[in-house]
C-alpha cells in the first residue's frame, strides 16, 4: 500500500502542497522489476516531478464517473508492489471489468512497453 496520510502530508508540506518521493522509494514501489541502475529507471526518476497532494487524500464523489457511459479497462500488473494483484482485482471489479494481466511491476511502460502496446492496440 502507499505510505500513510501523515507521511504524504509531511512530504507535501515540505513541497509546497505537492509530493515527490525520494528516488529510492520510487524505485522500491514502482519499478521493482528493473535493477536500480538500469537506464530506464534512472531516466524515469530524472523526469519525475512533484504531484499535488489533494487527489491522494481527498474523497471524490464517484457517482458521476460511474454514470458515464465510457469504455473501461483495467490492466493489472502482477508484480506490482504498490497495488498488489488482489487489490487491483478489487479495483477492476468496481469498474465492472475483468482485468487484463501483465507480468510486470507498476510501470509497464518502462519494463514491458511492447506488451503494454499490444494490450492498448486491442482496446
What would you call each of these model-derived segments?
Residues 46-65:
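Active-site nucleophile elbow and catalytic-triad environment of alpha/beta-hydrolase enzymes
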Residues 77-110, 123:
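Conserved loop-alpha-helix segment in the C-terminal half of the alpha/beta-hydrolase fold
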Residues 113-121:
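Short, amphipathic alpha-helical "lid/cap" segments that border enzyme active or binding sites
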Residues 68, 74-76:
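Short beta-strand/loop motif that positions the catalytic acidic residue
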Residues 17-47:
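Pocket-forming structural segment of enzyme catalytic cores
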Residues 67-69, 94:
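Short, well-ordered coil/turn elements that cap or connect secondary structure elements
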Residues 1-27, 55-56, 60-61, 83-84, ...:
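Flexible "cap/lid" loop of the alpha/beta hydrolase fold
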Amino acid at each position: 500500500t502507499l505510505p500513510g496520510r501523515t507521511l504524504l502530508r509531511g512530504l507535501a508540506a515540505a513541497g509546497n502542497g505537492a509530493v515527490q518521493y525520494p528516488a529510492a522509494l520510487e524505485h522500491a514501489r514502482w519499478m521493482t522489476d528493473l535493477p536500480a541502475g538500469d537506464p530506464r529507471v534512472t531516466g524515469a526518476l530524472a523526469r519525475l516531478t512533484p504531484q499535488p497532494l489533494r487527489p491522494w487524500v481527498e474523497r471524490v464523489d464517484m457517482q458521476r464517473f460511474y454514470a458515464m457511459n465510457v469504455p473501461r479497462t483495467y490492466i493489472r500488473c502482477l508484480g506490482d508492489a504498490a497495488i498488489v494483484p488482489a487489490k487491483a482485482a478489487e479495483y477492476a471489479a468496481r469498474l465492472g471489468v475483468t482485468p487484463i494481466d501483465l507480468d510486470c511491476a507498476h510501470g509497464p511502460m518502462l519494463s514491458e512497453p511492447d506488451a503494454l502496446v499490444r494490450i492498448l492496440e486491442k482496446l
